[in-house]
Design a protein with these regions (language model features):
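N-terminal strand-loop-strand
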Residues: 1-31, 79
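Short, charged/polar surface micro-motifs in flexible loops or helix N-caps
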Residues: 6-7, 18-21, 37-38, 56, ...
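The catalytic Nudix box helix
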Residues: 31-65, 79, 119
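Active-site-adjacent beta-strand/loop module that shapes the phosphate/pyrophosphate-binding cleft
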Residues: 67-104, 116, 138-142
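Alpha-helix-centered segments that form part of catalytic cores
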Residues: 105-121
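Charged phosphate-binding loop/patch that engages nucleotide di/tri-phosphates or the phosphate backbone
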Residues: 116, 120-147
Length: 147
């Protein structure tokens, strides 16, 4: 999700929940996203994941930005929607993890523990390195529609 504020582009990012991510900030934030099941429409999955991780519904006007290949070889389909929401109001789904690792102890954590709007420069510092190309796709799209 993106919005324009004072003629600047801002992107909505989420911070993963749980003890592993608790003290990590720069390079730890993410675009709300997730896996889709076999047979599930990727755009439907994107909408579902956004709602699960934030508690917010998105608009209908999603724009396909393309596909990026992450370091591990995974192909990620990227869409964007213009919108607005209050990060203080997020309500994330919960997930179960083993913590500490290999301990056999299961704990329930929020998939996302906070969210925020960031201008593109700051978003580049905060976002997971593997997701930075998604910001490039957004910027290229916005430049294209502005001309």
């Amino acid at each position: 999700m993106y919005r324009l504020r004072e003629l600047k582009v801002e992107v909505f990012l989420v911070h993963p929940g749980g003890p592993f991510w608790a003290k990590k900030d720069l390079g730890a934030w993410s675009i709300p996203k997730g896996e889709y099941a076999s047979g599930e429409d990727p755009l439907d999955a994107a909408r579902r994941e956004f709602a699960e991780e934030t508690g917010f519904e998105t608009g209908e006007d999603f724009i396909p930005l393309g596909t990026i290949k992450q370091a591990g070889g995974k192909l990620v389909s990227v869409w964007v929607v213009e919108g607005d929401c209050d990060p203080a109001q997020i309500r994330s789904n919960l997930c179960t993890i083993e913590w500490p690792p290999r301990s056999g102890i299961k704990i329930e954590i929020p998939e996302v523990d906070r969210a925020a709007w960031f201008k593109l420069d700051e978003a580049r510092e905060r976002i997971l390195k593997s997701q930075a190309p998604m910001l490039d796709l957004l910027l290229a799209h916005l430049k294209e529609v502005a001309t």
